[in-house]
Amino acid sequence: MLASACLLTCLGQIAQKYAVQGWRGAFPGVFAALRSLWLALACLGSGLLIWLLVLQRLDVGIAYPMLGVNFVLITLAGRYVFNEPVDVRHWLGIALILVGVFQLGRQA
């Protein structure tokens, strides 16, 4: 369930990015942006509901830091979906997040 909450939250963030990119273009782009915005709201809302279920089952001290995976997924999406630059320091930070999530996952 935690993975579902993370994935839906990340999909919502990616849809938000698509939505704001659509606002820059011509009128048909606005309609696509609105579609992306509704998709973002649906993903984020669903992710929130699943997150609430996760909090019923896991300690918040374990569950919340696991959301660090979102930083990893969003960085990968930024790099490979939106062609955004990611420098070495950012990758090192991502590696540290993954080590922390792995350590917490061993406790859960």
UniProtKB/Swiss-Prot annotation:
It is found in: Cell inner membrane. It is a multi-pass membrane protein. The chain crosses the membrane at residues 36-56, 58-78, 85-105. Its main location: membrane. Pathway: Bacterial outer membrane biogenesis; lipopolysaccharide biosynthesis. GO terms for molecular function: carbohydrate derivative transmembrane transporter activity. The keyword Ion transport does not apply. GO terms for biological process: lipid A biosynthetic process; lipopolysaccharide biosynthetic process. It comes from the Bacteria. Keywords: Cell inner membrane, Cell membrane, Lipid A biosynthesis, Lipid biosynthesis, Lipid metabolism, Lipopolysaccharide biosynthesis, Membrane, Transmembrane, Transmembrane helix, Transport. GO terms for cellular component: plasma membrane. Signal peptide: none annotated. InterPro entries: EamA_dom (IPR000620), Flippase_ArnE (IPR022883), Small_drug/metabolite_transptr (IPR000390). Pfam families: EamA. Translocates 4-amino-4-deoxy-L-arabinose-phosphoundecaprenol (alpha-L-Ara4N-phosphoundecaprenol) from the cytoplasmic to the periplasmic side of the inner membrane. Heterodimer of ArnE and ArnF. PANTHER family: 4-AMINO-4-DEOXY-L-ARABINOSE-PHOSPHOUNDECAPRENOL FLIPPASE SUBUNIT ARNE-RELATED (PTHR30561:SF23), SMR FAMILY PROTON-DEPENDENT DRUG EFFLUX TRANSPORTER SUGE (PTHR30561). Belongs to the ArnE family. This is Probable 4-amino-4-deoxy-L-arabinose-phosphoundecaprenol flippase subunit ArnE. It comes from Pseudomonas syringae pv. syringae (strain B728a).
